[in-house]
Amino acid sequence: MNRRKNDFLVRPKRIRCYTQLSTLPIDLIIEILSRLPMNSIAICRLVSKQWASILQSSDFTESFLIKSPPRPRLLFTIRYGSKWHLFSAPQPRNFDENFPVVATDYHKGFSGNWCMQSFQLVNGFIYLNNRLSLKGKIDRVSVIWNPSTGQQIPLPDLGVKNSHSKSFFGYDPIEKQFKVLCITSSKEHQVLTLGTGRKLSWRKIEYSYPHYPRKKSNGICINGVLYYRNTNAMIVRFDVRSEEFRFVEIKMYVEILSLINYKGKLGVLFPNTDLAQLWVLDDTNKVEWSKHNFVFPDTTFEAIRATDTGEMFCASSCWRDSLYVSYYDLEKESVKKVKIKGIEDKLSIGKHHANEFFIFPNHVENVMVL
């Protein structure tokens, strides 16, 4: 607006700033961008090649994790109709936290014949298989996916003919490297390392004891070590960094329900008619276990898992109007239920059942680009 001063017409001055991002120190740029929320970072990657390069650097990734330490979340994968849907909800940091109802965030819906039995969640990245029909032949395509950035990395073919394979996804926190271990029925062991900047390729590794994992064993990565079930009464221990195998004997001749991360240690769940039993591997060298018994109020659960703070939880496998997650504190021997809101509204499930439903703990947002 123009103003008059002493009968003279005074026009407001417009000040323009011509400072370019390229003139600012890189450290300052990283400091500014690392304070942005995740959805804004995804948009900033599209601004310019320079911004994309900065946001893909290891310096930015480390700065972002320091400025915005990720709070673990529950990840829900639901197949409804012909489509998969991904939701997440806050995970309690303290068993005494009082929030009987939590809202979910909707991340993405995607089509395809995805095999969620192969689903493995490690440090914000997801490994899963898609079954494709190519020229009348069913083929599997393995993909590493970061739901936070949207990056999808199809893995190269193993190059092994007429062989079934089983893969496990792990992360080395020291070298900050993701690796995929693949074991074929021909007893070949191969490893693929991601994020090296070179073309992805499989390489064979040495092993001292021929073995093949159980079909339903997805395995779990804990502090740089992959654990998965063998066909015998033992668990295989694979060090992601050194790529060495060790074997942990289980003197319990019943079917294992699942392997879990219990407060940074390997937990083995055994089913029972009246209660569940948890074995915790307290000493990996001496193979010493501590044992815990517990009972869940809901017997029709999808699976029993554990949060990063040690609460056991499960979600009902049959739900319509509302989804509840039950948490169990082993030390206090107490149970609480949390209502999960938003899934039924987004999918308009109503009285219909979801076709398939899986829940995974300890998901964190990761800005890393492999």
Swiss-Prot record:
InterPro entries: F-box-assoc_dom_typ3 (IPR013187), F-box-assoc_interact_dom (IPR017451), F-box-like_dom_sf (IPR036047), F-box_dom (IPR001810). Transmembrane segments: none annotated. PROSITE patterns: FBOX. Signal peptide: none annotated. It comes from the Eukaryota. Residues 18-64 form the F-box domain. This is Putative F-box protein At1g46984. It comes from Arabidopsis thaliana.
